[in-house]
């Protein structure tokens, strides 16, 4: 009786190579579905995967078929009403749709079926932040920020079929078969020599010759039963993500929590900052994040207070910029740090304070930061703060500003602000 033993440690993932091929082939449709799904998520839902839906028209394989209409001779098997050369009345509608034509009319236009499948958290985040990077990152003398890159790392006994090493697997197969059959082959050679000697001897020893032939046949059968290749022989190319030293960086997150920021606006700002936090923590190992909340006064807070504190008040945006400048001078030397900032506000500010914000950014902050992004979340017309910042955008290349009106704008704006730029890396 033959026994088959499944030694695969990753047997449940035996279709992983097909899954990866599918994700690569339909990446554009999947990314579009993810950009739509992220707007439906809870602000704090970052640990789960995502159900992705793709229109079936996008994944159908092309095929040739008979067009509708025209004259054709066709005999449908199994019918008891028609024979060859009978004329069948053309259905109403000619070459129209494929429906039965018996339903009620609809004004909703075309519909489409969708193919729905689940992607894991890692696949979700990889697609979410693909082709994004911190702009203008410079390598400084003291390197503490690690960016992970994939490198070959020898061979492993587990993996997906796409990474199998044929040469190394066959080498292991040969070594195993040699080790397992070496003793039997020596014994086989000895028996064959004895058989040859007995067959030449006089008188002929028929019983002994028959015994030797039987033992030789048994040994050969045992040798042949050793499988040509076994799961133990398989070796896969191993890849691992290694941290590559880069520059140390700090991200300042400045959020307006004044009374003019209603709960919906604050939720959109939090969504933007959660995306930013996930992007930084997934792409880079060591990035300092400084959280600053402000109304009439600014305060440096921890992550929990930044996202969940209910404190509110009036609006003086310059208080946050002043605090950021103080923190930079106290803890982050621009010669040693890549400094970034992301500011979110509804644009409502005390009118006399907006020129001061322009002055602080132009003279103190923008000259020392690598990149400064401003996001205005409002459906109203832009006010003095936006107009002051427009002058900065025209003057400084490291200043960017975007307008968010609805929740659907958050992810496209985020990608626009942090898309990977093709520029020469600075030493």
Curated annotation (Swiss-Prot):
Superkingdom of this protein's organism: Bacteria
NCBIfam families with a match to the protein in the record: PRK05325.1-2 (NF003707), PRK05325.1-3 (NF003708)
Recorded family membership: Belongs to the UPF0229 family.
Residue runs in coiled coils: none
Pfam families assigned to the protein according to its UniProt record, in alphabetical order: DUF444
Biased composition (Basic and acidic residues): 77-90
Region (Disordered): 72-109
Biased composition range(s): Gly residues: 92-102
Protein name as it appears in the record: UPF0229 protein KPN78578_11640
Organism this protein belongs to: Klebsiella pneumoniae subsp. pneumoniae (strain ATCC 700721 / MGH 78578)
Disulphide bond pairs: none
InterPro entries given in the database record: UPF0229 (IPR006698)
